[in-house]
């Protein structure tokens, strides 16, 4: 069986958040809606770069945008982020199991 490498694309949320600066932007937007200028200042990025990343995040449904006069405001889209959360949550059982094993081994070594 021959496997073809998947082309690098930003057509889905997983590929979009593979870029570290986009994750920074999402983290910054996590609690409230913010204007582009504030994102630029807070993350110390160039405005064209922020706008490009926001466009990608919007295209895959991770953020919503709204215009107020001349300013664009962005906020996270919970429905768009949900698939990322659900995927990451599948590992919760793994880590819980690992922590239980560590606890059991520590208790065995301490004679409990």
Where are these regions (language model features)?
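Amphipathic alpha-helical dimerization/coiled-coil segments
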Residues: 1-9, 27, 31, 82-112
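N-terminal helix-turn-helix DNA-binding core of bacterial DNA-binding proteins
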Residues: 5-48, 71-86
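Short, hydrophobic-biased segments on the C-terminal half of alpha helices
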Residues: 54-55
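Beta-hairpin "wing" of winged helix-turn-helix
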Residues: 58-69, 73-75
């Amino acid at each position: 069986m021959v496997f073809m490498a998947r082309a690098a694309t930003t057509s889905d949320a997983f590929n979009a958040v593979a870029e570290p600066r986009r994750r920074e932007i999402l983290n910054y937007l996590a609690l409230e809606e913010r204007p582009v200028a504030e994102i630029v200042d807070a993350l110390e990025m160039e405005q064209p770069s922020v706008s490009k990343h926001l466009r990608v995040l919007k295209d895959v449904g991770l953020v919503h945008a709204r215009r107020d006069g001349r300013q664009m405001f962005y906020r996270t889209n919970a429905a768009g982020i949900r698939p990322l959360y659900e995927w990451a949550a599948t590992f919760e059982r793994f880590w819980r199991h690992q922590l239980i094993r560590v606890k059991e081994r520590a208790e065995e070594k301490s004679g409990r």
